[in-house]
């Protein structure tokens, strides 16, 4: 694996000079191998090690290199044709392979090659970009988008129209991460490498980036870039220092544990916020 990483790191340093026409065989094979390993879930761009999320930057570099070494090509779809550098993940799947891998894909959901989809996942008409990882038992609902290299945990529900930000455009240092057992409400956006920790519930229409203030109304604490585990979050506003105007924020209205979540439905958690 170290040898593979070394090839990727070396190629990335000279990426400006690499084209589909002049890329060397060693680099092409290394990039293709990484994309295949990401696609199968054998590798992932970020993983939790000793309780901390670690981003493997060299894997992200391999994803970026894949755009340098490949020409656009025609991609056939059921209702149309497309023209892109990245093949679709399910282009060569037959019924037996879908059954073996154990997830459902509802048309016209689109998943790029290099994204991993785990067992018991349901993809409604949605989009999952290259390098993303969607873990077991999760639902990517209609018109939701999982951005490049984003990490989605087990038993996560991404509601209709949710946007989970990617790292490639614009280039971000770390992927956006939604940990296990989270619920992200309709039309919410989580971007710029924000981490939503385990068991959190994000209400409809909440927008969280690195500069968004995440205000805990019980403690008065303000978080940036991280939603603490077990938080129930709604959109809100905080006053300016001079009191003349207010600015958008996300508000943690309560904290819940796994026991409470198992007994209380998501809708009830969001409706009883006073």
From Swiss-Prot:
Its EC number is 2.3.1.117. Pathway: Amino-acid biosynthesis; L-lysine biosynthesis via DAP pathway; LL-2,6-diaminopimelate from (S)-tetrahydrodipicolinate (succinylase route): step 1/3. It is an enzyme of class 2 (transferase). GO terms for biological process: diaminopimelate biosynthetic process; lysine biosynthetic process via diaminopimelate. Pfam families: Hexapep_2 (PF14602), THDPS_N_2 (PF14805). GO terms for molecular function: 2,3,4,5-tetrahydropyridine-2,6-dicarboxylate N-succinyltransferase activity; nucleotidyltransferase activity. Keywords: Acyltransferase, Amino-acid biosynthesis, Cytoplasm, Diaminopimelate biosynthesis, Lysine biosynthesis, Repeat, Transferase. It is found in: Cytoplasm. GO terms for cellular component: cytoplasm. PANTHER family: 2,3,4,5-TETRAHYDROPYRIDINE-2,6-DICARBOXYLATE N-SUCCINYLTRANSFERASE, MOLYBDENUM COFACTOR GUANYLYLTRANSFERASE. Homotrimer. NCBIfam families: dapD (TIGR00965), PRK11830.1 (NF008808). This is 2,3,4,5-tetrahydropyridine-2,6-dicarboxylate N-succinyltransferase.
């Amino acid at each position: 694996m170290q040898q593979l990483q070394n090839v990727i790191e070396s190629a990335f340093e000279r990426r400006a000079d690499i084209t589909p026409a002049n890329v060397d065989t060693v680099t092409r094979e290394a990039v293709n191998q990484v994309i295949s390993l990401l696609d199968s879930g054998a590798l992932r761009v970020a993983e939790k090690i000793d309780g901390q999320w670690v981003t493997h930057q060299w894997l992200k570099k391999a994803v970026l290199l894949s755009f340098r070494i490949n020409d656009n090509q025609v991609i056939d779809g059921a209702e149309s044709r497309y023209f892109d550098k990245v093949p679709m993940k399910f282009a060569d799947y037959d019924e037996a392979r879908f059954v073996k891998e154990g997830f459902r894909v509802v048309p016209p959901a689109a998943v790029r090659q290099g994204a991993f989809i785990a067992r018991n996942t349901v993809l409604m008409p949605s989009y999952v970009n290259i390098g993303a990882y969607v873990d077991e038992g999760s639902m990517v609902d209609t018109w939701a988008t999982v951005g490049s290299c984003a990490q989605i945990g087990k038993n996560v529900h991404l509601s209709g129209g949710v946007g989970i930000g990617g790292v490639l455009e614009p280039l971000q240092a770390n992927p956006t991460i939604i940990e296990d057992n989270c619920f992200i409400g309709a039309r919410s956006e989580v971007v710029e490498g924000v981490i939503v920790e385990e068991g959190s519930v994000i209400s409809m229409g909440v927008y969280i980036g690195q500069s968004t203030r995440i205000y805990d109304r019980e403690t008065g604490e303000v978080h940036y870039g991280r939603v603490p585990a077990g938080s129930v979050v709604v959109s809100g506003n905080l006053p300016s220092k001079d009191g003349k105007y207010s600015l958008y924020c996300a508000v943690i209205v309560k904290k819940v544990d796994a026991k409470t979540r198992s007994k209380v439905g998501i809708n009830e958690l969001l409706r009883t916020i006073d």
